[in-house]
Amino acid sequence: MTGVPQIEIETVNEEDVSRRSFLQTGGACFAGGLLLPRFLNEQLAVKELQAGDSDRMWGVAMAYGGGRLDLIDLDNAKLLHSFEGIRATHAITPIEALNRFVIHGHRADSKDGAVVVFQVDPVKKTWEVILNKELPGGPALHWQPNPEFTEIVFNTVGDGSLHVLDTKDLTIKRYDGGGQHSNMAFFKNYLVATDKMSGPTHLNVVDRNTGKMVAKTAVGHWGHGVTVNHERGEAFVWASEGVHVVSLAQKTMGKHLRLLVTENLDERCWFCWTPQGGRYSHDVSWNPGDEYRPYLLVTDMQKGRFEKIPTGDPKLQPSYLQLSPDGKWGLASLRGLEDIAIFDTVANKFEGVVKAGPARASFFERDMTFCRKRDCALVTNTGDNTISLLDLKQKQEIRRISLPRRPLWLKVISPA
C-alpha cells in the first residue's frame, strides 16, 4: 500500500457514550462470560480503490486474530466491538438465513471446547451474544455444517466426542464415535466421521436415533477430507492412497466400495464440498513434501473420476480454497502471490484472478468469504494486517481496511 495516506484510528471517548446504550449492547456479553474490553466504535484506516463504493451495502464482518474477535461495520469501516475470552480455531461460520455468526474453539482460561453464537443485524449494525456454551472434552477444532446450514457438528479432540448444534434453537447434542481431529459430514440421520488424521484411519458412522456406531471402515492412511454424495448414499474420504468410497446405504452400510487413485499420491488434501452433493473440490494443505500445481482438482462423485480446472499459467497455483455457501463459486489463494483465483465450480471453469493484498506463507494463508449475492467477497491479507473487499464481476479490489492486528479468520453477513 505504498503511497496510500495513513489514517489514524479515532477512538470514541467512553464518557461520551450513552451508558444506557452501552448496557443494552454489552450486557449479553458480560452475562455470557465473554470479556468485552471497552466500547470501541473505532474508525479504521481505509483505502478507497474505486468510486461508487459508498452505495454498496456490505454489512458486518466478524474477524479473528491475536486472541480477539472483532465485529466490523464494513459500510463505514468501523470497529463496532472487540471480544476476548475465546480462542477461535479454524473458522467462523456464518448462518446467512438467520443473520448469525457461529464461533468455535475454547475459552482462554479453559482446556474445554466452546461455541459462541452472535445474532447480528447487517443493516442496523446491532449485535447480541445469544449462546456462549462450553463443550466438555477438549478444544473444538474441526467442524462441518450440513448443506442447509441448519446444523453444525464439532469435534472435541480430548475425548473424541461429536457435538451437533441446531443453528436455529441453539440446542446441542453430544454423540460418541468421533476421534482425534475428526473430519465429519452429515447423511440423513447419521453422522460420518474419521477417527484421526495421521496413520491408519477409519470412517465411523453413528446413528443419531440410537447414539450408537453402526459401521467402522478402514480408509487407508492419513484419511483427511470427508464428504458425502447424498444422492448415491456414498462417503468419500481423501487419503494418501487416493479417495476411498464407502457405502452409506442401509443394506451395505460401511462397505468399502472402491478406491479412486489420483495422479499425485501421498498429498494431504482438504475438501470443500458442494451442497448439491454431486461434486466437490480439494486444495493442497500446507505440509512438508506437498507440491502446488496450476490447477484445481475436482472429484465428480457421480461418475467417480477426477477433473482438472487449469489456471492456464504455471505461476497460478491454488492453495487455500473456499466455496460459496451455495457451492457455485470458489475462491483460492495463489501460493506466493497477492492474487485470488475465481472458479465457477458448476461449469468447472477458471474465471480469472483479482488482486488483493499480501499473504503470509503458513498453514492457512488467508481466509475468504462471499457476500450474500456472491458478486463480492472479502479476503484477509495476513501480510499487512488488512482485509480486501473485492468486486468479483469487475475483478477489482475496491476497498482495503487496516485492522489493529493480523486477521486470521473472516466471515461476512450482508443485507438480503
Language model feature labels by segment:
Residues 1-21:
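N-terminal secretory signal peptides
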Residues 17-18, 23-35, 39-416:
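Predominantly soluble domains enriched in secretory-pathway, periplasmic, or organellar proteins
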